[in-house]
């Protein structure tokens, strides 16, 4: 409402929109169309597609010149049909939903396991596939040896953990076991 009341368009970056829809047990219609979104970048790449994001316009004014804008913005590749073709099974067979359920469930599984470590603090109550976790700074180096580690807050040492469409229970167990090894080696060292 604020955007439209101030003559602005409302764009939603939907890179993880499937995760949000699944997490809230909602629908794309409820989350996007019914809320007055004008333009959605509908994500596929972060939810299992090889490559591809779709720009979906719900606003006739924006749609008028969109083919021109798309070309001028260098978003029209010569083999676009191969990128676009992925969306057919992705949507019709609800691959988007299956993949989002998996990544959200694996994040929840990690959260449940990490909560058992007294040295760990879960910062966000994420329903999706991203966790922000405060860990001891001494854990950074050993974690970086085995996993890509992204520290989002250097001062508080908060890391970002992201699960994906292909994260397995074995991946989660390996990660949690490794955290346990780090904690154990630190405990043994300080005795």
Regions found by a protein language model. Name each.
Residues 143:
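Conserved nucleotide- and phosphate/pyrophosphate-binding catalytic cores
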């Amino acid at each position: 409402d604020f955007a439209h009341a101030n003559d602005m368009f409302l764009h939603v970056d939907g890179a993880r929109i499937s995760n949000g829809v699944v997490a809230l047990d909602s629908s794309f219609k409820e989350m996007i169309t019914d809320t007055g979104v004008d333009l959605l970048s509908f994500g596929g790449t972060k939810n299992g597609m090889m490559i591809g994001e779709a720009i979906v316009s719900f606003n006739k004014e924006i749609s008028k010149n969109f083919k021109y804008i798309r070309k001028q913005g260098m978003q029209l590749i010569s083999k676009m049909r191969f990128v676009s073709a992925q969306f057919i099974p992705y949507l019709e067979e609800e691959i988007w939903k299956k993949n989002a359920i998996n990544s959200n469930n694996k994040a929840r599984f990690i959260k449940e396991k990490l909560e058992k470590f007294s040295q760990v603090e879960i910062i966000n109550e994420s329903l999706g596939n991203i966790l922000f976790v405060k860990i001891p700074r001494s854990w950074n180096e050993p974690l970086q040896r085995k996993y890509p580690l992204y520290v989002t807050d250097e001062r508080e040492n908060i890391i970002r953990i992201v699960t994906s469409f292909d994260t397995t229970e074995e991946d989660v167990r390996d990660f949690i076991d490794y955290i346990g090894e780090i904690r154990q080696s630190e405990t043994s060292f300080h005795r």
